[in-house]
């Protein structure tokens, strides 16, 4: 089936937020109910894995310059995009699989692939004015993996990472000597952290990596030097060869509970309430001042609810059109909290159901709240990189 794409406005987030916000409320009764619904039916070692992707094959990519008119190429105003790009981006999509096997197939005629397309529209599209976009479809770990305590979740995440790593090696072959960005969200960011730690940090590739946008998965400040011994964190809007990260919350909210994390010593549980590495996605600094988004018109409106909540039970794709636009006069304020979270406040935010739920976590809009700001920052860092090369 072939989804339809357009650029019309929409205002539906509730169902998507409800599903993704469960990620941050591990101890909640609601999560335990849903968790049992999606818990894999057998141990990882008894589970026959899906066939591995072959990244020489175009069909193993969710986005690729040869895949024309995909959702990653959407723009809010039908902007004409330049054919030639001076950079590439390796985009690692978040979890979209809520099935009862440990790892997803890369079959494109599935609800989880349709959700990948929604993520391409809502996240990867921020890079399409400046970069050739490469996004591997990989055997992502099921959503339940993050909460499993038997070790099977780690194994599922390790299998997913193996695919991402193989795709990255092919990406390097495909782009030649072009500079590149890394961009990721949620599960994708967990894999991105490991990829950069193993294959970019301290190598010549770090000089070609303009920046890494590692969004929506916590990185403890205390783990930065364990993960990245040479690469610096970005402290200004134009800095290059550096790392950017944030997790978005409502004013005064925190991230509670635990998540799996990886560093060169292995896997561990991290407490999300500890101090995190964070960047303000409007000022692109690491200070704690409130910054206004006034008149920036940077917030992306994206309708993909039917691909998320109904996909938990639906066996077939919905073929619902993916629609993006920019909100006008999307005024709110952003600062880094004392714990490194991107904390936001303002009346505009009331339209997002994550705030209305009173949970305070805006994981579902980590990218779309700052879509225009990301887009401009990518241009700025790319131009700065090219100036330095000349």
Question: Residue spans of the language-model regions?
Answer:
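Active-site catalytic motif of lipid deacylating hydrolases and related acyltransferases
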Residues: 27-46, 82, 92-179, 342-390
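Proline/glycine-enriched tight loop/beta-turn segments at coil->beta junctions
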Residues: 81-87
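Structural recognition of the beta-strand scaffold that forms the well-ordered cores
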Residues: 88-91, 134-137, 181, 211-214, ...
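Hydrophobic membrane-insertion alpha-helices, especially the h-region
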Residues: 11-22
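Single conserved hydrophobic/aromatic residue that forms the stacking wall/gate
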Residues: 1-9, 13
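Gly/Ala-rich beta-loop-alpha elbow adjacent to hydrolase catalytic centers
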Residues: 184, 188, 192
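Surface cap/lid and interfacial helix-loop subdomains adjacent to catalytic sites
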Residues: 165-175, 198-351, 384, 388
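N-terminal hydrophobic targeting segments that direct proteins to the cell envelope
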Residues: 22-69
């Amino acid at each position: 089936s072939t989804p339809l794409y357009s650029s019309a406005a929409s205002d539906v987030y509730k169902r998507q937020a409800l599903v993704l916000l469960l990620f941050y409320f591990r101890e909640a009764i609601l999560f335990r109910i849903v968790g049992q619904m999606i818990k894999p039916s057998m141990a990882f070692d008894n589970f026959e894995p899906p066939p591995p992707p072959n990244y020489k094959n175009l069909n193993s990519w969710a986005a690729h310059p040869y895949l024309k008119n995909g959702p990653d190429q959407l723009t809010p105003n039908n902007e004409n995009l330049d054919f030639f790009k001076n950079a590439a981006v390796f985009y690692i999509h978040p979890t979209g699989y809520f099935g009862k096997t440990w790892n997803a197939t890369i079959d494109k005629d599935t609800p989880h692939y349709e959700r990948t397309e929604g993520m391409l529209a809502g996240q990867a599209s921020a890079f399409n004015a400046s970069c050739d976009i490469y996004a591997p479809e990989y055997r992502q770990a099921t959503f339940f993996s993050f909460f499993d305590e038997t070790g099977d979740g780690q194994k599922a995440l390790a299998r997913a990472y193996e695919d991402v790593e193989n795709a990255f090696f092919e990406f390097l072959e495909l782009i030649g000597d072009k500079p590149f960005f890394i961009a990721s969200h949620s599960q994708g960011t967990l894999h991105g952290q490991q990829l950069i730690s193993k294959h970019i940090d301290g190598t010549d590739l770090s000089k070609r990596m303009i920046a890494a946008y590692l969004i929506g998965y916590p990185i403890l400040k205390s783990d930065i030097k364990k993960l990245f011994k040479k690469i610096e964190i970005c402290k200004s809007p134009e800095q290059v060869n550096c790392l950017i990260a944030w997790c978005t919350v409502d004013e005064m909210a925190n991230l509670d509970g635990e998540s799996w994390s990886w560093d060169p010593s292995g896997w561990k549980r991290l407490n999300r309430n500890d101090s995190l590495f964070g960047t303000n996605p409007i000022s692109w600094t690491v200070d704690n001042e409130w910054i206004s988004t006034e008149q920036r018109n940077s917030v992306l409106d994206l309708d993909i609810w039917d691909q998320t909540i109904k996909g938990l039970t639906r066996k077939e794709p919905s073929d619902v059109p993916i629609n993006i636009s920019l909100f006008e006069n999307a005024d709110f304020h952003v600062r880094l909290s004392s714990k490194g979270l991107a904390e936001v406040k303002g009346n505009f935010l009331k339209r997002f159901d994550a705030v209305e739920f009173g949970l305070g976590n805006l994981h579902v809009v980590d990218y779309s709240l700052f879509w225009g700001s990301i887009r401009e920052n990518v241009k700025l860092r790319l131009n700065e990189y090219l100036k330095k090369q000349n």
